[in-house]
Amino acid sequence: MKVLLLEDVKNLGKAGEVCEVKDGYGNNFLIANQKAKLATNEVINKYKAEVKKKAEKEALEKAQKLQMVETLQTITLTIHKKVGANGSLFGAITKEEITERLKEQHASLNLDKKDIELKHPIKSTGIYEIEVKLGSGIAGVFKIDVVAE
């Protein structure tokens, strides 16, 4: 019996491969545990279409992330904070505050606080470079300008 593997099976093959197996093994183990489907033309074509659709979706998401990084690199985010006598801020600037200000000033950019990498807390005025990691090996840098109110 021929089956289409839905996931990697040790000593048999990888997901997406069509393998010849004994009827009992195919029906009682692979198909019963949803590790494979009976390899008909319809099932194979449907699987290939799903794989193609998934690849197109991933390519689109990657393109959107690259576009977001390009846009981020051109902006400077301004944050106004209260400052003490010695020039230090009352409290530090957090990832959450950066994402909120980014949404206020640039509504088209939708970053999550987990995407922002702060190496150390921002506790004084000045211009800082903030690293952004969007997954899939896509990273970028944008600047924030912390100004006294």
Curated annotation (Swiss-Prot):
GO terms for molecular function: rRNA binding; structural constituent of ribosome. Keywords: Ribonucleoprotein, Ribosomal protein, RNA-binding, rRNA-binding. Binds to the 23S rRNA. This is Large ribosomal subunit protein bL9. It comes from Helicobacter pylori (strain J99 / ATCC 700824) (Campylobacter pylori J99). Belongs to the bacterial ribosomal protein bL9 family. It holds the Pfam family Ribosomal_L9_C. One of its GO terms (cellular component) is ribosome. NCBIfam families: L9 (TIGR00158). One of its GO terms (biological process) is translation. Transmembrane segments: none annotated. The keyword rRNA-binding applies. The gene is rplI. The keyword rRNA-binding applies. InterPro entries: Ribosomal_bL9, Ribosomal_bL9/RNase_H1_N, Ribosomal_bL9_bac/chp, Ribosomal_bL9_C, Ribosomal_bL9_C_sf, Ribosomal_bL9_N, Ribosomal_bL9_N_sf.
